[in-house]
Amino acid sequence: MGLWYRMLENQDLEEVITVRVQDPRVQNEGSWNSYVDYKIFLHTNSKAFTAKTSCVRRRYREFVWLRKQLQRNAGLVPVPELPGKSTFFGGSDEFIEKRRQGLQHFLEKVLQSVVLLSDSQLHLFLQSQLSVPEIEACVQGRGAMTVSDAILSYAMSNCGWAQEERQSTSHLAKGDQLNSCCFLPRSGRRSSPSPPLSEEKEQLETWAPVMDSEGPSSESPTLLPSSSLPACWDPARPEEGLSVSQPARRAVAADQAGPMEPTQLDTAWDK
């Protein structure tokens, strides 16, 4: 009884937001409009989010747009920097991996800011697959759905993630660590110690992509040590989740697979 009470008390005191940027893929390879996009996996128990589990794909150009919007709406609050553009692509896999790390660091910092976390465009960016024009229309009230409805609709269409995530957890290597885990202590309460790793993993496994209609919370996040996290599963691509350090994949048929040529990717990196 004491252990269960302590777990409930700790869960009530702390909110956690976990974000991972992984699985870079080259889209439209060989064409003039080829580009690289990245899978963004988010898992949380925070009331700031409508859906507790989400997984979307975004390209670098969309990150650039997001930062501009956050900067415009944040006033004097500083917005984290994005990884810079590059004009030389001698080692494409190395460049993509460095960019992936930079994008993840950007999101980690953004999610630690209460002001930035309150921006509806950030939530649509992370928890829906709406395009940039569709996001702008939605937040301006010109879309077919509200912000919450758009997120709920996308979450319901991908509700099979929960079962897959729980299955993936049992196969994680012991050394696999979270790339980002932000705990948000509730204001006005004394923060209690975090639970042991085994208890925290059990809590992660029981989280389902349930939807929360409550408004954003006002807690300030602090970054704590990492722990185990299930890999993200994309229903459109049912293969197993990839390691975050795995080189970019080509979004082409198996009989067309082959090594990527740097000249083919000249138009991809900054889009």
Curated annotation (Swiss-Prot):
SUPFAM superfamilies recorded: PX domain (SSF64268)
Keyword annotations: Cell membrane, Cytoplasm, Endosome, Lipid-binding, Membrane, Protein transport, Transport
CDD domains according to UniProt: PX_SNX10 (cd06898)
Membrane topology: Peripheral membrane protein
UniProt binding sites for a 1,2-diacyl-sn-glycero-3-phospho-(1D-myo-inositol-3-phosphate): 59, 85, 99
Cross-referenced Pfam families: PX
Segments of skewed composition (Low complexity): 213-230
Entry keyword annotation includes Cytoplasm: yes
UniProt GO molecular function: phosphatidylinositol phosphate binding
UniProt function note: Phosphoinositide-binding protein involved in protein sorting and membrane trafficking in endosomes. Regulates the levels of TRPV3 by promoting its trafficking from the cell membrane to lysosome for degradation.
Domain notes: The PX domain mediates interaction with membranes enriched in phosphatidylinositol 3-phosphate.
Subunit structure: Monomer. Interacts with TRPV3; this interaction promotes TRPV3 trafficking from the cell membrane to lysosome for degradation.
Similarity comment: Belongs to the sorting nexin family.
This protein's name: Sorting nexin-11
Species of provenance: Mus musculus
Organism phylogeny: Eukaryota, Metazoa, Chordata, Craniata, Vertebrata
Gene that this polypeptide is encoded by: Snx11
